[in-house]
């Protein structure tokens, strides 16, 4: 068992998405990508819609996820992430993601949209693009 482990807990409105020991988690904050390991400094960070990388204990394989945003609470031995949506790369339905994006793009073309609706639709497009990019692109940032 690795001594360099930290607990990662990811929760969504549906419950626990991930709850296990990891060596490192890489996620994108408003300041850019950060890697979090055991003995990290305490931090609360806003997570941008992006790829999230999970390196489990004694594994060379990365788990890659599409996260729609959220908040990370980081301390010395634990990382807690709260998000409204996250899914593993292999679970992303690419056609559904593309169709969802097309629907939102059509809504965005309607005249007389309020500023808040435009912002809401743009965020939904950003999240859809993230899911599409995570599914299509290589396993890098």
Curated annotation (Swiss-Prot):
Membrane topology reported for the UniProt record: Peripheral membrane protein
Main localisation: membrane
GO molecular function: ATP binding; proton-transporting ATP synthase activity, rotational mechanism
Entry keyword set: ATP synthesis, Cell membrane, CF(1), Hydrogen ion transport, Ion transport, Membrane, Transport
GO cellular component, one term: plasma membrane
Compartment(s) of residence: Cell membrane
SUPFAM superfamilies assigned to the protein according to its UniProt record, in alphabetical order: Epsilon subunit of F1F0-ATP synthase N-terminal domain
A Pfam entry, by short name: ATP-synt_DE_N
Family of this protein: Belongs to the ATPase epsilon chain family.
Subunit-structure text: F-type ATPases have 2 components, CF(1) - the catalytic core - and CF(0) - the membrane proton channel. CF(1) has five subunits: alpha(3), beta(3), gamma(1), delta(1), epsilon(1). CF(0) has three main subunits: a, b and c.
Function text: Produces ATP from ADP in the presence of a proton gradient across the membrane.
Protein name: ATP synthase epsilon chain
């Amino acid at each position: 068992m690795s001594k360099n482990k930290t607990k990662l807990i990811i929760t969504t409105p549906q419950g626990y998405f991930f709850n296990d020991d990891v060596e490192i988690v890489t996620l994108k904050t408003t300041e850019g990508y950060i890697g979090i390991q055991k003995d990290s400094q305490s931090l609360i960070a806003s997570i941008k819609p992006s790829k999230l990388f999970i390196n489990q204990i004694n594994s060379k394989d990365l788990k890659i996820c599409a996260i729609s945003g959220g908040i990370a609470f980081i301390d010395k031995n634990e990382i807690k992430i709260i998000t409204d949506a996250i899914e593993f790369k292999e679970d992303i339905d690419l056609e559904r993601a593309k169709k969802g994006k097309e629907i939102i793009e059509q809504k965005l073309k309607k005249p007389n949209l309020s500023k808040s609706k435009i912002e809401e639709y743009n965020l939904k497009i950003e999240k859809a693009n993230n899911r599409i990019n995570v599914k299509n692109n290589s396993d890098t940032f």
